[in-house]
Amino acid sequence: MVILGLDPGFASLGWALLDCSAQPRCLAGGVIRTKPDRTAARCDDNVSRCGEIADAIQQIYKEHRFAFVAAEAQSWTRHANADRAVAQAWGVIAALSEVNGCPVIQLRPQDVKHELTGSR
């Protein structure tokens, strides 16, 4: 089974296409990077950057086949602006998954660590 793993972010969003068969391996991966447009209003810039993320993820959907998307769950910190930006990236991921008919599972970082290392 092949899955698409996503690490949501606004300035950079990591992705990896993983073959989870008996011999697990990474088939492809990369980082989607966006840069702020200092000349645009903040809301216009965020919309533009969401568009960049959407275009890049949609290209992954076009080029690869996978059973589902596994993405890091949204967490909330004391940094409202950063949290809002990650939430916008999450919205893009959710919308594209729905449009492409691909289920999404959310994984908490501490759960992934526990499964891989056995410690909390």
Name each model feature, range by range.
Residues 1-120:
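Phosphate- and other anionic-substrate recognition elements at nucleic-acid/protein interfaces
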